[in-house]
Structures are given as structure tokens and as C-alpha cells.
């Protein structure tokens, strides 16, 4: 049975289209994760030589590690005044608190939105607003449970202060947790960020705090799931009548 050229071209086009569709659905791995995924993969091969069931366990861990370091594309709302989530995870706390001293944002309370990232969330962090990085401050510390309120004071953390064009200063704090022992930041002082732009990651479970001026209109509540770069946390253009801080 012969197949004409037109049929072959049609089949090839369908295969290419299918391959593109599959690639679009699979998130790439962030380069910072290559050593970890490679290490797990190598360990899996060795475990297969030792005992096959161990090899399969290693394979599952390799897949989990690859998923942990996934670096998906996100569709970010860009209207002036919107504040988007800097991390994937659960909004664990919303409260008015005095920001950490290293942020140099004064001693008046600001609205703090805390987002807890489990080991199953994507851990690439994104800028919640557009603006210029005024300063980046690293502070060593403990590694207690990141869900606890005191983790914002006691744990290892890396802080960014971003100056927005029209809405003042916003603080973003990466906080290490029980498992996470390494905070990574890709940016530097003076750099300009777009809303939703990647600026860092925290390895294996952690927390992100966002500090906003009091009176900012909040659009989320405690317990809600947030998606980095997409979920809108607040709106500076609706500064009156912010939400009450309570769990639903």
C-alpha cells in the first residue's frame, strides 16, 4: 500500500502540532534545580543496581524533585495598582504588624500577607509589584516551622524593598522553613522589576511575606490558595475600606 506525499506531510504536521501541545503542558525545570534533579537521577540509577525496588523509589523522588523545581509560565495581570502573589501556596496569615527593622519601613504597622509554601508547591518567587529594588538584606537565623508567626522574626530570611512608581514602598521577605535551608535571589540593588517577574526561590518548603501600606484594599483572605504571578492580593487604586482580617 502506497502513501502519497500529501498524506505524509499531513501526518508530520499533526505530530509536530502534538509535540508542541505536550511541551506547552509540561513546565520546564528552573536551572537552579538541575544539580538536585541530576543528583536524584544518578542516585536512582545506582539504587537500581543495588535493588530494583529502591531504584523505583529513587525514580519517584526524582520526579518529585523535578516537579518541585518546575518553572511554569504565568499570565500576570498588569493593571496599575494591582499586587499579585509572589509565591504559590496557602495564605496562612493576614495581619497588621510592624515590618522587620532591616526593611527600614518605619515603626508603623503595615499589612502583612503571609503565604506558606509546602514541599509540593512551585517555589519560584515572583515580584508582587512593578518597581525598583531599593535594597536587599539577608539575615541568618533559625529554621523553625515557617507557618508560625515568630518565624518572621527568628528564621533565616532575605528581604527586598521595592519602590513602586505611584504607590510607595512594598516589602517582600523570603523566609526559610523547617526543610528549606537555602534562599536564592537572582536580582540586585537598583534593578527594575516588572509585576510577576521571577526574582528568586527557596528550596524545599518555606514562606513569603508581603508588606503593604495600611488601608490597602485586600482582595484575598486567610486559607485561600494563591498562584504566583496570577492571584491578585490587593489593589492600591481602591485604598478605602480594606477587608477585615479574619478567617472564613
Curated annotation (Swiss-Prot):
Reaction equation(s) it catalyzes: a 1,2-diacyl-sn-glycero-3-phospho-L-serine + H(+) = a 1,2-diacyl-sn-glycero-3-phosphoethanolamine + CO2
One MF term in the entry's GO annotations: phosphatidylserine decarboxylase activity
Modification(s) after translation: Is synthesized initially as an inactive proenzyme. Formation of the active enzyme involves a self-maturation process in which the active site pyruvoyl group is generated from an internal serine residue via an autocatalytic post-translational modification. Two non-identical subunits are generated from the proenzyme in this reaction, and the pyruvate is formed at the N-terminus of the alpha chain, which is derived from the carboxyl end of the proenzyme.
Pathway(s) served: Phospholipid metabolism; phosphatidylethanolamine biosynthesis; phosphatidylethanolamine from CDP-diacylglycerol: step 2/2
Membrane topology reported for the UniProt record: Peripheral membrane protein
GO biological process assignments: phosphatidylethanolamine biosynthetic process
Residues with PTM Pyruvic acid (Ser): 206
Record-annotated site: Cleavage (non-hydrolytic): 205-206
Principal cellular location given in the protein's record: membrane
PANTHER family recorded: ARCHAETIDYLSERINE DECARBOXYLASE PROENZYME-RELATED (PTHR35809:SF1)
Subunit field text: Heterodimer of a large membrane-associated beta subunit and a small pyruvoyl-containing alpha subunit.
Stated name of the protein: Phosphatidylserine decarboxylase proenzyme
Amino acid at each position: 500500500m502506497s502513501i502519497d506525499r500529501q498524506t505524509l506531510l499531513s501526518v508530520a504536521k499533526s505530530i509536530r502540532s502534538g509535540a508542541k501541545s505536550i511541551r506547552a503542558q509540561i513546565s520546564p525545570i528552573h536551572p537552579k534545580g538541575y544539580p538536585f534533579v541530576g543528583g536524584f537521577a544518578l542516585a536512582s540509577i545506582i539504587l537500581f543496581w543495588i535493588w530494583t525496588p529502591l531504584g523505583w523509589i529513587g525514580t519517584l523522588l526524582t520526579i518529585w524533585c523535578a516537579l518541585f523545581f518546575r518553572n511554569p509560565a504565568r499570565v500576570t495581570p498588569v493593571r496599575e495598582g494591582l499586587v499579585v502573589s509572589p509565591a504559590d501556596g496557602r495564605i496562612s496569615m493576614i495581619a497588621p504588624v510592624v515590618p522587620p527593622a532591616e526593611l527600614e519601613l518605619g515603626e508603623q504597622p503595615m499589612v502583612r500577607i503571609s503565604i506558606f509554601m509546602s514541599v509540593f508547591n512551585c517555589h519560584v518567587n515572583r515580584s508582587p509589584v512593578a518597581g525598583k529594588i531599593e535594597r536587599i538584606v539577608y539575615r541568618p537565623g533559625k529554621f523553625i516551622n515557617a507557618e508560625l508567626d515568630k518565624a518572621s522574626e527568628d528564621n533565616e530570611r532575605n528581604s527586598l524593598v521595592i519602590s513602586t512608581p505611584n504607590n510607595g514602598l512594598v516589602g517582600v521577605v523570603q523566609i526559610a522553613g523547617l526543610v528549606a535551608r537555602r534562599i536564592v535571589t537572582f536580582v540586585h540593588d537598583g534593578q527594575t522589576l516588572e509585576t510577576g517577574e521571577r526574582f528568586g526561590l527557596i528550596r524545599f518548603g518555606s514562606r513569603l511575606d508581603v508588606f503593604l501600606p495600611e488601608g490597602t484594599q485586600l482582595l484575598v483572605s486567610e486559607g485561600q490558595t494563591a498562584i504566583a504571578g496570577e492571584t491578585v492580593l490587593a489593589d492600591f487604586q481602591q485604598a478605602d475600606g480594606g477587608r477585615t482580617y479574619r478567617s472564613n
